[in-house]
Amino acid sequence: KSCCPBTTGRBIYBTCRFGGGSRZVCARISGCKIISASTCPSYPBK
């Protein structure tokens, strides 16, 4: 599960993933976090 700080971060993450980037790389460049929990800590959920 990915958690992003805002909609812009989510858009960057999704675009990166669509382009073939790994979850880790896309999370790093977008400011998102990859977590194992089912809910995001004070981040918008997707």
Swiss-Prot record:
It is found in: Secreted. Thionins are small plant proteins which are toxic to animal cells. They seem to exert their toxic effect at the level of the cell membrane. Their precise function is not known. This is Viscotoxin-1-PS. The keyword Secreted applies. PROSITE patterns: THIONIN (PS00271). One of its GO terms (cellular component) is extracellular region. It comes from the Eukaryota. One of its GO terms (biological process) is defense response. GO terms for molecular function: toxin activity. InterPro entries: Thionin, Thionin-like_sf. Disulfide bonds join C3-C40, C4-C32, C16-C26. Keywords: Disulfide bond, Plant defense, Secreted, Toxin. The keyword Cytoplasm does not apply. Pfam families: Thionin. It comes from Viscum album (European mistletoe). Belongs to the plant thionin (TC 1.C.44) family.
